[in-house]
Amino acid sequence: MKKILAILTVFFAAVVATSCVKPYELTEPLTLDNYDLTIPKTANKKGINGENIHYFCITATGDWEATLEFPSTDDLWCWLNDSYSVAKKDEYGNQIKDEYGRIQTEQVKVASGVEYFPGGEEDGKFRVVRGSAGTTYLPMQYNDNAGVVRYATFRVRRTDMDYEKFTNITQSK
């Protein structure tokens, strides 16, 4: 009888212990893949046909809002894109090029569930983006300008709590 009671005690203790274990959760409600980003005059990442592009990786456990902030409101030297270019490929996986040797591209939307708000002087240039839980890669495109140092701040905050991350962006000479 004592043996059965001991087995039942161990069994119920194991059931209670496993029922209290929470599923995997992120240690932070929001992460941003880089801090104090410096963009050299020669771009750190190039797009398919030479565009100056940097990708931010945002991982959040809930709704978030990302904003590009500038020292001057008319200084839109970088912006968030709602899509990015990928190379067109043939049935064998080779990149398709035109008669001049340029890679043919097609536009891909960033992600479903990401909402863009206009803020630039042209279509497709955004300063504010909202998204939901999960991981999102946001492309930021920027203009090169020789001999000029420019600044911006990329700020991401959780909309349902007082929690944010930001990175300072500097374009060097």
Residue ranges and their predicted role:
Residues I4-A13:
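Sec-dependent N-terminal signal peptides
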Residues V16-S19:
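C-terminal motif of bacterial Sec signal peptides marking the signal peptidase cleavage site
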Residues V21-P23:
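Bacterial signal peptide processing site
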Residues T27-K41, E51-Y137:
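Surface-exposed binding patches on compact interaction domains or structured appendages
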Residues H54-F56, L138, A152, K165-T167:
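Hydrophobic residues positioned within well-ordered beta-strands of beta-sheet architectures
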Residues T136-Y142, G147-D160:
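A short beta-strand micro-motif common to beta-rich folds, especially ectodomain repeats
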Residues M161-K173:
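C-terminal edge beta-strand
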